[in-house]
């Protein structure tokens, strides 16, 4: 999938799940299941409930996403 096809939205982490997955509530009210991107995992960036994050969604499945950025 080309990189420019993904939809980037902001949201808030609600709860951590096993295997580096998180339940994220987007700013528009939708709930998605998101995992951490490889670069964030490589650099040991911690994500806690309540953190504001940027999530990339695929246009094919809008219920799953990838966390690409954690706001400071």
From Swiss-Prot:
InterPro entries: NA-bd_OB-fold, RNA-binding_domain_S1_IF1, S1_domain, TIF_IF1. One of its GO terms (cellular component) is cytosol. Residues 1-72 form the S1-like domain. Disulfide bonds: none annotated. SUPFAM superfamilies: Nucleic acid-binding proteins. It comes from the Bacteria. Keywords: Cytoplasm, Initiation factor, Protein biosynthesis, RNA-binding, rRNA-binding. It is found in: Cytoplasm. One of its GO terms (molecular function) is rRNA binding. NCBIfam families: infA. Component of the 30S ribosomal translation pre-initiation complex which assembles on the 30S ribosome in the order IF-2 and IF-3, IF-1 and N-formylmethionyl-tRNA(fMet); mRNA recruitment can occur at any time during PIC assembly. Belongs to the IF-1 family. One of the essential components for the initiation of protein synthesis. Stabilizes the binding of IF-2 and IF-3 on the 30S subunit to which N-formylmethionyl-tRNA(fMet) subsequently binds. Helps modulate mRNA selection, yielding the 30S pre-initiation complex (PIC). Upon addition of the 50S ribosomal subunit IF-1, IF-2 and IF-3 are released leaving the mature 70S translation initiation complex. This is Translation initiation factor IF-1. It comes from Myxococcus xanthus (strain DK1622).
């Amino acid at each position: 999938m080309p990189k420019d096809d993904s939809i980037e939205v902001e949201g808030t982490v609600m709860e951590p799940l096993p295997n580096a997955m998180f339940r994220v509530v987007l700013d528009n009210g939708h709930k998605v299941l998101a995992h951490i991107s490889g670069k964030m995992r490589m650099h040991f960036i911690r994500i806690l409930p309540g953190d504001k994050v940027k999530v990339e969604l695929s246009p094919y499945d809008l219920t799953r996403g990838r966390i690409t950025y954690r706001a400071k």
